């Protein structure tokens, strides 16, 4: 009897151990899974991250990491700006309006923009579809950067030349014009048209009015030395359809599920003919189509000040993923070779393909920060040396001509360097100073500190030369007067 009881006890104990192991396994797996998303957030240096997977029926899984700029935990209701994924909404809306007979996709742009008659764009024969495909010949941005819709139209009118029609060249300006064209043709605002046509089809109602987005979406972040700085770029209504729709990760995943269903069924917007961009890429209705060893991914990414985004799906597996995170700056883009971020690599692996490129190991944005830090320290040491030699050194005997040359060289080099540091980034990148502060606050702060140091150094050199000249004259006068 004792032996039987012992065996029963051992069997019971074994059952408990097995049950505990079984129950613990999912928790361990869940912990490992959470570590994966935390690592992605760390690699992105993102304060907040949302990853939502989907299939043709909707959301299948979701993970959230970190906080927004108000220190609220990222979750299902957290709002992000979706960036250039917005272009696929605008393209789909244009195609729906074309079905309703409100827009002719094959019409020349001059039908909807008579002010372009006789301009470089008006003369090249670009159509509405060319705006969708980025084949209208327009540049990516205008330089200087426009402040409102009229400045965009005026900037396009003033372009001395444009590329030939048919050559794909990604252009944000094309989609600003496409949104305005839609509004002109339909006689209603972009937001109202989305709510009337696209939202009922997709089941998704993104934030599409500038005042609502500006007041409800928490600020994003830009890299700032070893951390991040909360930044906000005020959005205007004319640029919503180009890259500023906003919403949650779930909403974007539901939209992705609609796009997946439409593609699988061969329905709008997948029916728009595609244009080749490179050997492995095509572009359709606001989406890229890329081949990975026989597997095609359909996707678009987005990057606006403070926010990064990705939405894509694999038609063959029926799986899709959305990645949203609340940091983006010019330094990020330099660090990641433009668009090859850890998020892109993560998304492609999630969709079952081997990424063609990995994130860059050489972070050029960080290199610039370190270089400018070294220059700031060097300039400060030089200022200290100039002051020290001025106070402790006997004024050297130099000719007036040599002093004039020294002063002139200091002024030319100093003023030139200051102007280059203050206005060079604006001229080079075509951004305004406020926009550069939003997208690259640490780099711009360093430029201004370095410019101030050079201005002080230039002033010290000039004043020191004048003081030494005065000392030399006084010494000469005393020598002349002495018996």
Language-model features: locations:
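Bacterial N-terminal signal peptides that target proteins for export
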Residues: 2-14
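C-terminal segment of classical bacterial N-terminal signal peptides
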Residues: 19-28
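Catalytic loop of the DD-peptidase/beta-lactamase superfamily, centered on the K-T-G motif
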Residues: 31-55, 234-483
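Short, conserved catalytic-motif segment at the N-terminal edge
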Residues: 31-82, 102, 118-119, 153
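Extracytoplasmic/secreted proteins, especially bacterial periplasmic and envelope-associated proteins
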Residues: 32, 36-39, 84, 89, ...
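Short active-site loop at a secondary-structure junction
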Residues: 44-47, 71-130, 161-173, 384, ...
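Short, surface-exposed loop or secondary-structure junction motifs
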Residues: 65-67, 120-308
């Amino acid at each position: 009897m004792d032996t039987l009881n012992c065996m029963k006890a051992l069997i019971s104990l074994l059952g408990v151990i097995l049950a505990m192991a079984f129950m613990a396994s999912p928790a361990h797996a869940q912990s490992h899974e959470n570590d994966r998303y935390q690592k992605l957030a760390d690699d992105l240096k993102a304060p907040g991250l949302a990853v939502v997977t989907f299939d043709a029926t909707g959301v299948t899984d979701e993970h959230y990491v970190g906080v927004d700029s108000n220190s609220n935990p990222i979750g299902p209701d957290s709002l992000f700006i979706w960036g250039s994924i917005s272009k696929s909404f605008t393209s789909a809306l244009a195609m729906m309006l074309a079905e309703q007979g409100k827009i002719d996709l094959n019409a020349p742009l001059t039908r909807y923009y008579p002010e372009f008659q006789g301009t470089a764009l008006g003369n090249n024969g670009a159509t509405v579809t060319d705006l969708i495909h980025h084949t209208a010949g327009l540049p990516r941005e205008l330089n200087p950067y426009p402040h409102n819709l009229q400045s965009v139209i005026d900037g396009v009118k003033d372009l001395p030349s444009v590329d030939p029609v048919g050559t794909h060249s990604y252009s944000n300006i094309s989609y600003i014009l496409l949104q305005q064209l839609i509004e002109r043709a339909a006689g209603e605002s972009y937001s109202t048209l989305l709510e009337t046509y696209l939202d009922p089809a997709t089941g998704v109602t993104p934030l599409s009015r500038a005042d609502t987005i500006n007041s409800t979406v928490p600020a994003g972040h830009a890299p700032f030395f070893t951390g991040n700085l909360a930044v906000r770029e005020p959005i205007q209504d004319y640029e919503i359809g180009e890259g500023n729709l906003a919403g949650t990760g779930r909403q974007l995943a539901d939209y992705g599920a609609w796009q997946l269903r439409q593609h699988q069924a061969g329905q709008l917007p997948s029916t728009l003919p595609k244009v080749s961009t490179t050997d492995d890429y095509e572009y359709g209705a606001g989406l890229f189509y890329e081949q990975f060893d026989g597997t095609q991914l359909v996707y678009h990414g987005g990057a606006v000040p403070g926010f990064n985004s990705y939405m894509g799906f694999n038609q063959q597996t029926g799986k899709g993923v959305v990645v949203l995170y609340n940091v983006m700056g010019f330094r990020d883009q330099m660090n990641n070779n433009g668009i090859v971020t850890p998020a892109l690599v993560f998304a492609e692996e999630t969709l079952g393909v081997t990424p063609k490129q990995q994130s860059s190991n050489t972070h050029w944005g960080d290199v610039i920060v370190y270089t400018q830090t070294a220059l700031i320290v060097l300039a400060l040491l030089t200022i200290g040396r100039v002051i020290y030699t001025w106070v402790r050194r006997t004024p050297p005997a130099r000719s007036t001509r040599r002093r004039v040359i020294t002063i002139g060289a200091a002024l030319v080099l100093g003023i030139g360097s200051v102007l280059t540091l203050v206005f060079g980034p604006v001229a080079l990148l075509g951004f305004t100073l406020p926009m550069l502060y939003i997208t690259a606050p640490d780099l711009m702060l360093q430029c201004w500190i370095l410019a101030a140091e050079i201005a002080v150094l230039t002033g010290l050199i000039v004043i020191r030369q004048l003081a030494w000249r005065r000392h030399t004259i006084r010494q000469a006068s005393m020598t002349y007067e002495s018996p």
